[in-house]
Amino acid sequence: MRTDTDFAKQISRYLSEYLPHERNVSSNTILSYRDAFVQYVEFMREKKGIKVEKLRLENFTKDNVLCFLNHLTDEKHCSVKTRNQRLAVIKSFSTWLQYVEVGRMEQWQKIRSIPAMRDMERKLNYLTLEGVKLLLEQPDANTPKGQRHLAILALMYETGMRVQELADLTVDSVRLDVEPYTIRIVGKGRKTRIVPLFKSIVDILRIYLKSEQHVLKSASIQHPLFYNTRGE
């Protein structure tokens, strides 16, 4: 990229001086930033008719950046994630320009005001009631192993707890002797929350707790509520 225009000059300074020496950015990250600018330069040449040797900071505007971003999704069929990554690079460059090209502060701030695109195509996946029922019917509730699996599935569905939170449960985490039936969950940052349990889940847990396998292993209420397949 030639350095005979103010745009090329500042791009070179940004990539070769600011990012590696002031921000201590890795070489791989710098390469990804460079690729984003290469795409922008190619867009300006192909769609705006401005060759790289003629491209100036005055052409680096909010309107042109928006056209570039739309070009990525509409014509290049890039994902929303890729579009937002390119926007993040451009915003970072614009932030830096606020300090080295102060005279165009408003121009850079307009670019920085461009919002990231929400991925409207991303849908939340969830189980239907029929799916949950089918899932809970899979373990063989007549065996200790099946009772364990059923208790795990039912608890995770009922409480929405994370896998690690499930692994951290101890025998005394559950209160099944009197109402209200509850379970104490320790989450991130050792934050504790008390979650109520429906009677249907309580019945499943009671059967599991009474199983021969669990009684033999859980002599202490501080022992794990669920052992792994190796009995640990």
Predicted regions and their residues:
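Conserved catalytic core of the tyrosine transesterase superfamily
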Residues: 1-232
